[in-house]
């Protein structure tokens, strides 16, 4: 897997991307546990590593088309990593649990932060990213193309611009950011939902972000939407009500919520908004 490729979008946006190597197509058969699956590849059944320990039960259905990255390590027990699934009526969904953080890291590197630290220790947790930026620098470090270039999507792009600029409103000489990333792969009727399984860790992260607001940080929760045709994420309260409650408490406390739709291909993924 390659990271750090920088790509300019059609509207002048700059986006970090990631790319897989040695991708092969297969047919999903079954999943005996969280870590492995049985997949038919070129007529042969293979035991493969699933790069997502979540349930993914709406995606990993018998017979669906999946995409796998072939490992270059001959000593591995499994020769393939299952990274993406075709969902009927939706398209390609990236289920690689490492992909959201990697894509966001490359995306953030484009913007002029004085500091950018992954896996930052805050209190008794690790937050995905810590960033610093001088107040003297321009606010709009998320850059978007001119509105007239958006071909009918002016209002949405302007709303995104306003949302991202709102995040920057803070007093002091240095803006200090804490950003937690959550990957969303669950879709129902065009809406993304998170989580797809109970996540006490996710609840803890939200509570830490809420505390960070009280200490003067700009706290952000970013949902990386690893599938097409989805631009919003709702809390999946049917699966984990506590996460939904913690998300609402965090929002009311001032934690900013970002929705980052992605373009997904079998070879990779990048943030498209």
Predicted ranges, named:
Residues 57, 89-118, 136, 142, ...:
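Acidic-basic catalytic patches of nuclease active cores, encompassing PD-(D/E)XK
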Residues 45-57:
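Beta-strand/loop nucleic-acid-binding surfaces
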Residues 16, 227-273:
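Domain-level recognition of nuclease-like catalytic cores that cleave nucleotide substrates
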Residues 181-183, 187-200, 207-239:
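Nucleic-acid nuclease catalytic cores
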Residues 34-38:
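Short aromatic-glycine-enriched beta-strand elements
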Residues 55-67:
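Short nucleic-acid-contacting surface segments enriched for D/E, G, S/T with interspersed K/R
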Residues 26, 128-145, 152, 169-196, ...:
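Conserved catalytic cores of phosphodiester-cleaving nucleases, focusing on short active-site segments
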Residues 30, 70-75:
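Short, charged beta-turn/beta-strand-edge "cap" motif at the junction between a beta-strand
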